[in-house]
């Protein structure tokens, strides 16, 4: 890997770390899945029949918002939250890059082992 490729990989990892950190919580993942399945909802709707308090939901949504996964909009006294699918696509693309890197590394290992065992 060239110095340029190493620098690019480091920058991508630096950019991706907050995204994966935001996804590293069960409650936040549940909120994302809920918004994906049901569409935009208020905090009041999300807290109905939930063991999580409105305050906790608000804090989790703020983390997701800071990472770009959701956006909120005031409608009167309510704050309506919606999923931002592009950010999910960004994470998917990052995971694809990581998978390709592993595929290449495994291919190099396979080639090395086969060359080492050649007569």
Residue spans for each PLM region:
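C-terminal structural segments of small proteins and small subunits
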Residues: 84, 88-112
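N-terminal helix-turn-helix DNA-binding core of bacterial DNA-binding proteins
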Residues: 2, 6, 10-53, 67, ...
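Short, charged, intrinsically disordered terminal tails
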Residues: 12, 107, 111-119
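Short, hydrophobic-biased segments on the C-terminal half of alpha helices
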Residues: 61-62
């Amino acid at each position: 890997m060239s110095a340029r490729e190493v620098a690019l990989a480091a920058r991508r990892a630096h950019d991706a770390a907050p995204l994966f950190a935001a996804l590293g919580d069960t409650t936040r993942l549940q909120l994302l899945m809920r918004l994906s399945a049901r569409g935009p909802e208020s905090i009041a709707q999300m807290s109905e029949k939930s063991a999580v308090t409105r305050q906790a939901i608000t804090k989790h949504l703020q983390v997701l918002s800071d990472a770009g996964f959701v956006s909120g909009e005031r409608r009167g006294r309510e704050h309506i939250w919606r999923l931002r699918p592009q950010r999910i696509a960004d994470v998917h693309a990052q995971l694809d890059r990581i998978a390709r890197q592993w595929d290449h590394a495994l291919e190099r290992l396979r080639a090395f082992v086969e060359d080492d065992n050649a007569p």
